[in-house]
Swiss-Prot record:
Belongs to the TACO1 family. It is found in: Cytoplasm. This is Probable transcriptional regulatory protein Franean1_5147. GO terms for molecular function: DNA binding. The keyword Amino-acid biosynthesis does not apply. Its main location: cytoplasm. Coiled coil: none annotated. NCBIfam families: PRK00110.1, PRK12378.1, YebC/PmpR family DNA-binding transcriptional regulator. Signal peptide: none annotated. GO terms for cellular component: cytosol. Keywords: Cytoplasm, DNA-binding, Transcription, Transcription regulation. Gene3D superfamilies: 1.10.10.200, 3.30.70.980.
Amino acid sequence: MSGHSKWATTKHKKAVVDARRGKLFAKLVKTVEVAAKTGGGDPAGNPTLADAIAKAKSQSVPNDNIERAIKRGSGELAGGVSYESVTYEAYGPNGVAVLVECLTDNRNRAASDVRVAITRNGGTPADPGSVSYLFNRKGVVLIDKTPTLTEDDILLAVLDAGAEEVNDVGEAFEVVSEATDLHAVRVAAAEADLTVASADISWLPSVSVPLDAEPARKVLKLVEALEDLDDVQNVWFNADISDDVMELVSS
């Protein structure tokens, strides 16, 4: 007898989801704290902080947590930590390029944890610059679809704010801009009564590697292992995984 009741399985799954949610909250709060430390605690004069707060709120991070992070970052509250931003590069299975963005208070720990996760999951650490040239740093705003909303409507609303292109990505429209124009594009979209689902600085691949189910499974396992690390904020990779392949991998 396995001793694994349906309730035990459900409870385990809930524990995993709760743990991941807790990690996500911690990462978002860390971003808010760093933004406040870098540019001050007033979101009106600190676009990076305004975007970090908006993202945290979109993921239901409690307001108290956000406020405390702002106060720690701006020095109003004791207990602030000095975080360092560092990016690691790697090749994953099938030569997929991987960028790992970290915010850490211990660079040696972050480097060690990232290296272990990469090598244990079929990847190879790469020298600085050997992978990043395959990506462009951009601002990406996702806008919820409505029955009547078109790409032209969105472009008209956000073009003057610095939008470069609008793409239909299935359940949303994606607005791409220079990273420095992200906040202006998000504000322009909101002022045009468009529903902003997210606004992030992203590393978009200039070249993609199409993957079948088995290599896709391996790459996603690597990405999941990296995202599970406390110091890791974002993982970017240039695998092109179609909806059909993703369905196979998820089943």
